[in-house]
């Protein structure tokens, strides 16, 4: 399809959707569906109109170049318009890129220590807090779903729901293995230790996204335990949900209520099943496009935090920042912005722009 034809079809569809919404003949479900479509089309149409307006102004200025009295003014106007066109064209191309349906969603964050013992658990706790601060800076709601500590106040497992607009779009690049290099507080010889933490960021799934049959679930209840293994209450409030077809297991004991723990576990289960479907779809598409930043593979080492050097390096794009204190304080924007630009560049190339 020719580029101009594609633009005309988008504008025509936007006008059609607007007319349907104004007809007063839609069911509530249809109106909601069309409202979502219109919200997606509106920024694309705005980019199309801005680019077309600039092209029309350019043509008008060029037409005046043959008029001796208007030539100087036309040349000035033409220079101004041509200076804006590259940015308008780039914005239009970005607007036309295929959208990840999950980008606008809230997200579920999961953090676990991997290699490195107690030091990995301590860094996992620090990273969990860093994402909490990043969420607060963005005005998102950070709700702890599960927070299990080890014996040295490190983290055995942390889960949180991060609610807000475009949370997944910003945090999806964080999935993977995060490596930390530093001297542990218990190290008397001053030797640098290397530890790793795994981070998973999943788009929050609604019940309509994933079908979970009760017959496919095994629900076990047990007494919640603390860091040392001791029982912390006398009732069986902890819940373990096993999805037998997939083998996915979710255990939850953060709440004192068995009902609340089960609801949280089901929320995590839906997100993991939804992400599994997305991963299968991504694997199919990956054959056509080698992506450096968009894999979301939690086994991939993506970043190193070197405390003695004050350095954070993202290995996917070879970005190094000597701002470790600020990043651990929740300032991830510079890294995420760079990763976003890299993926946009990959997508633009794949689309032939």
UniProtKB/Swiss-Prot annotation:
UniProt keyword Membrane, yes or no: no
Protein name: Peptide chain release factor 1
Functional description taken from the UniProt entry: Peptide chain release factor 1 directs the termination of translation in response to the peptide chain termination codons UAG and UAA.
HAMAP family per the UniProt record, alphabetical: Rel_fac_1
Predominant location category: cytoplasm
Classification via SMART domains: PCRF
InterPro entries, A to Z: PCRF, Pep_chain_release_fac_I, Pep_chain_release_fac_I_sf, Prokaryotic/Mito_RF, RF-1
Subcellular compartments: Cytoplasm
Record-level GO cellular component terms: cytoplasm
Alphabetized Pfam families for the sequence: PCRF, RF-1
Family indicated by similarity: Belongs to the prokaryotic/mitochondrial release factor family.
UniProt-listed Gene3D superfamilies: 3.30.160.20, 3.30.70.1660, 6.10.140.1950
Keywords: Cytoplasm, Methylation, Protein biosynthesis
Post-translational note: Methylated by PrmC. Methylation increases the termination efficiency of RF1.
Signal peptide boundaries: none
Positions bearing N5-methylglutamine: 230
Keyword Protein biosynthesis: yes
GO molecular function per UniProt: translation release factor activity, codon specific
